[in-house]
Amino acid sequence: MFKSKKPIIDFKGTLGDELKSRRIALCITGSVATIKSPEIARELIRHGADVTCIMSDGALDFIQSMLMEWASQNDVITKMTGSMEHIQLIEEGPEKIDLLLIAPATANTLSKIASGISDTPVTLLASSALGSGIPIVAAPSMHSSLWSNSVVKENLDRLRTIKVDVLTPQIDEGKAKITSTEVIVDAVIRRLTPQDFSGIRVFVTAGPTYENIDPIRIISNKSSGKMGFALAREAWRRGADVTLVSGPTKLTPPVSID
């Protein structure tokens, strides 16, 4: 019977507690982007989450389950057994997950989920999660020709209509590369945050401003922009449509915000 471990993780919650007491199932499918999966697991934990990894056979062709066991500090599910792990993770109980994250998500896996096919540990758990109302976030990774395929597009649209958050990949070098870990973690946090700002448009100004006195002199301030960036990110996580305008700062703007 599958049971999560009681890990001792010295870095848990070091970046925040937005995911404290939240259980995330990180589903990993067969893509070269699986090399980012340990980083994704660790970042979720740094925001307070408990992470359980589920790997398809294709994912195991790229990385070993031992790596994800180390990254998550939990047992890894690589096949479904008579213990019915896909039921343990979605029914009320100590192992129940709050969200299912598929990262990376291949065209094959996404199309199977859209069609109700459940022939791998990942697709079986996804089908169970959909039937139980558990939120799903997917981070696609595939060649650009697959991303542009009309059938794949139809399948992605079908997933969106049933409330699966399909993140936009980074189109680069002829590939639809998995989006950044920051975007993935932000999407998970947003999906698990009450959307009490939904339908609200928020305009945030951050950082220093400059007002000319004459062609040489200005009036300014030493604002770092941290407060404005934090307010913009929090409003976005709570469902707002956020526009952020910033003066020159040393900060990197939140990538999920315009």
What are these regions (language model features)?
Residues 1-225, 229-258:
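A cross-family phosphate/adenosyl-ligand binding-site feature
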